[in-house]
Amino acid sequence: MGSNKEAKNIDSKNDRGLTSITSNKISNLKAHDNHTSSMITEHKNADKEKGKQEKESRNGTTQSSSSVESHSPQVSHHSDKLSSFDSPLHLPNFRLADDLFSNSSRRSSDSAASSSVSKLKSAQLSKIGLHHHHTSNNKHSHRSGTPTSEVKANYSPDPSAPRFIVSNMVGNGRGGGGLHGATSNVVKKLHSRKKWDWNTLPASDSSLLIKTVSGNHNLINICIDGEFKQIMYDPNHNELFNRMDLFLSFNMDSSPEDSLIFAKKRLRSYIDFLTKYLESRKYAFECYPFNIENIINIETEVKCFPSFDPLKDYSEIESLIQLWLAQSQKFLLQSNSFFFSSEVVEELIKRKPTTRQHSNPTISTTSNKISDPTLYIQQLDIEANSPRPVISDPLDEIDILLIRPLHKTLGGWQLAYDEPSLNIADFALDLSPWMIDSSDNDAQNKNASEIAPEYLTNLQNYLPRKGSRAKIVSDEQEVIELNSSNASEYMYDCMNRKFFTDDAKERISRNNFNQGVEEDPLNDQFASSRSLSLPSSGADAVKRKKSPTKATKKSGFVNFFKRKHSQLASTSHTTSPSVSPSISSSSSPKIQPQSHISSPPRTEKAPHVKSANQAHQNEWLENFFCRTLNNYKEIDLPTQFILPKEVKRSSNAQLQPEDEPPLSSPISSNSDNSFPNEGLDRAKSAAIYGKEYLKLRLPFASDTIPAVICPWVWTSLSYYKWKALLREIYRSIIPGGYALAIVPDLRISNTYYTGILGNADAEKANNSSEEFLTTKERDKTFDAMAIDAINKGLHIHPTKHLTRTFKDVGFTGIKSSVLSLKTGDFKTDMGFLNEFNSLDMWDYMLRRQLPDSSCPPKDTDPTTLFKRYVEEHIGKIDDNAGCFRTLYVVAQKPKLPYTK
């Protein structure tokens, strides 16, 4: 009896101890103290939840990642110091289910995959208490304040300080420094380090990425076989390593709900950064993106301005802002991605098995079968002698075409990550020839040297031209059109590598899609971990896009709209593409005027010696990134415009002296013998006659794309240009295909501070206007932008007109919805989220429409207006501040030819 009572007392005490420990873990989101709790004997008749708690208590404060972990879903092992929890992914080192975060399952093509992945992650993470909104004590959450660290870590209270990790912990693991053995020991031995708060923007001189002490390498935590491990990589190996590291780390660690929970914190951080940025730059050469110093074609005239600071790097800040906006859009739309129509997603998924039957995507006559027949899906743990997927028509593999502006560089990655069961083609649209301001006739009559300073005062005309991806031709036959034979030249994966191997390229050129792939696995060390979409690491197989470097800069106006060609010769991973001896005349370079992550030119050698193990890790990580986004393809073709020869000759006659020879054709414009002012003259011609004659031509054949989404570009185009762009989209879509568009208004709606006299609401607003003076100042800036937009032929409220344009072009089944976000609410989380979205668009339009800081709107100070606006409204609700509207349109192309 005595022993039974003692046992009951012990059980009751332990139960109370478990309750307190569990509550502390959930409320603080931190590991418990290092006290070792008493060992508890599991009761045979206990239920699953109690058994889980007893096992956690029996294991003490945590096991390391390298220890043997149970596969039982009832057990969740945590580390005492949560070394993996301090990783950039912010996830504890627990054993994940086999299908969680794994690439093979996340990239499945069943109909539920598109919407279930994000829900699965949220549900799984909420069970272990990672989500802030599941806790009762928000004050102690690691997300709610500045970055924190464990007691034994070197704590740094400055959130902008760079994070470092001891580099000698890498490469000393079991198996002679092998990849998996070393990383397991790294997770085991790694000291706790500072946790980064994804809801705060870093300083311009710091980095979100984890760097080694030497600064030559970065570290990333990725999920391998259901366990998070740390990989060290060389950022100079691939210029996109840093950007992909930041992108994946944010998406794996943060959920759409965070955009609401931390809306106030994000808004404050954004306003603080924006104020410092505008005060330091004083609107000199303001244009999105913020990272202007990394634009490849900025010339010496720009760098002479006092506000230009080459030491400031806003690339990671800009990337994080884009990720915040994409996340908030998903939350506001309650969708899995900014591809907002779930019905269209279901139709595209249903279409996949039927439309791909003609390609006969079967494996050769062996007993081994690959469960998912979709091309380019990486099969994990595949043997070297296993059959490979066959090649199918690359154009048939495109499900969604994203047409985006140049500065939205993460849009394609985000859509591919959020819609893993659909194949995404990313095409950057350069509409600068349509947006050239031809009103300044005096400037057009000046020579090139006189024109440059004048054009530099108006950045929205200047920046899009520098490094322009536009190409103007005189004959429709000169337009490059993507097809099955040349797709291997213009399609790239997320790591800027050719999407096809040489063998696949040769077979595609023959249009033979049903033969097996024969490769020698002995000559390819990555044969077991590489799909057809991943080029091998050999020097004869790897082909990358040409990366712009400082050595390739030319004069911006001499190079104006000049057709360039990419270098297609085979290079190794460590060879700069800019020194390729072979140049193809059939493709254009991959120009990135808004490059996010700055890195040294590929021609510069790293100061450290690369080991064989490090090269292996770089190659492995590159392939891992491509497998993670294996449904992403980038179309590396310029935006092509057709200018008729008659118009071109007449414009040249007006712009050139009689004794000057005529301009050469666009085909030969890349020749070294071309005239210095050729690009400038072509730009003048386009500026003068573009509104009537310049015709856009998308590089896709008619009736080839199942669905097209085109956000963010409509506010820059007039009504007639809407029709021209929609006609091209209509032509490219297959019968029965879909077109989606997103467009915001250029000004705030329903604000009563500028209402008509006699209106009761306007009089009430004006009577209380003394409380919110910055709202009236904000409306003055919108009025100035509206006048500028009207002068350029733009619609102030495109949400009222774009739907009609879809109907005029020939689309049917048009569905539209307007999302109205109330502004002026600085008292609720939803109000802060609305303000963040509206303030971002306000800032973008202000710097784009009114770039000249010397003449701001009357009685306004745009440099400090954003901060004053927030400080005046914080904790209050301005009922008369109006609302910010965004239109979402989805339309279908008729299945039968449309006749009007």
Swiss-Prot record:
Composition bias, Polar residues: 17-27
Coiled coil location: none
Biased composition (Basic residues): 129-143, 543-553
Top-level taxon in the UniProt lineage: Eukaryota
Phosphoserine found at: 105
UniProt KW keywords: Phosphoprotein
InterPro entries recorded: SAM-dependent_MTases_sf (IPR029063)
Biased composition (Low complexity): 63-76, 103-127, 528-537, 570-601, 665-676
Region (Disordered): 1-84, 103-160, 512-556, 568-613, 648-676
UniProt biased composition (Basic and acidic residues): 1-16, 30-58
Note: Present with 623 molecules/cell in log phase SD medium.
Name of this chain's protein: Uncharacterized protein YBR225W
Source organism of the structure: Saccharomyces cerevisiae (strain ATCC 204508 / S288c) (Baker's yeast)
